[in-house]
Amino acid sequence: MVKVYAPASSANMSVGFDVLGAAVTPVDGTLLGDVVSVEAANHFRLHNLGRFADKLPPEPRENIVYQCWERFCQALGKTIPVAMTLEKNMPIGSGLGSSACSVVAALVAMNEHCGKPLNDTRLLALMGELEGRISGSIHYDNVAPCFLGGMQLMIEENGIISQQVPGFDEWLWVLAYPGIKVSTAEARAILPAQYRRQDCIAHGRHLAGFIHACYSRQPQLAAALMKDVIAEPYRARLLPGFSQARQAVSEIGALASGISGSGPTLFALCDKPETAQRVADWLSKHYLQNQEGFVHICRLDTAGARVVG
């Protein structure tokens, strides 16, 4: 049997709509991600378990893990009978790359089970295709960091899908999921079809400056450039209490904050453990809306998807 863990990810990072994403892991050792196991069988079977298994489609063919198996078999040109188990630890529609976790874990597990017939580039292309079935369009800002680890910048030129951007070891990512669902498709539909020239210029300046600051090792500058003129001005209205939370974490000392992916998870960047804890405490009390919500203090997950059994 092969068992693969795929970590949560925070896409966009305010400054890089659809082109930046970071894999994250809680500092307390909690596994924030999905696990898929694969073993040989006489015919295909899929079993779901985990905290959020009851939120998955009841029809197996609608489950993205089934679709991953089907697409992987197509890529190899043969049917591979396996029993798969999805441990669904990630809330759906959370802005933490939930569908990407399932897709990445399923495809890596299938590839490992079959002796790695597909290389990383081919696997990543399949991951983007399958994740796009859920979000409505192909983009790699969750699957790339989830698969490869760290911060990833989407390139999609010269056969290169993404490349790693150096992160900062001192950065702590406080992630607060309020316990409500935001559909990625709905969050995309709310965005305008056209943007003002000054917003396009600001977006380019922020993103170019952020990448430069990462490579020139200027964490304060990088954090200061994490501004969103593309999505947050429109999506904030979908997130109850978001604007107040941003103001509060800034006053506590967060370097930057914003919407993780399409929401509703809020991320706040801190460079001191005590600041991160104070931010986490405030968000736990004021941003969470129900028992399904949670707050984690995380660092970059530099390993990405990995075999755990």
Curated annotation (Swiss-Prot):
The keyword ATP-binding applies. It catalyses: L-homoserine + ATP = O-phospho-L-homoserine + ADP + H(+). Keywords: Amino-acid biosynthesis, ATP-binding, Cytoplasm, Kinase, Nucleotide-binding, Threonine biosynthesis, Transferase. It is an enzyme of class 2 (transferase). Pathway: Amino-acid biosynthesis; L-threonine biosynthesis; L-threonine from L-aspartate: step 4/5. It is found in: Cytoplasm. Its main location: cytoplasm. GO terms for molecular function: ATP binding; homoserine kinase activity. NCBIfam families: PRK01212.1-4 (NF002288), thrB (TIGR00191). This is Homoserine kinase.
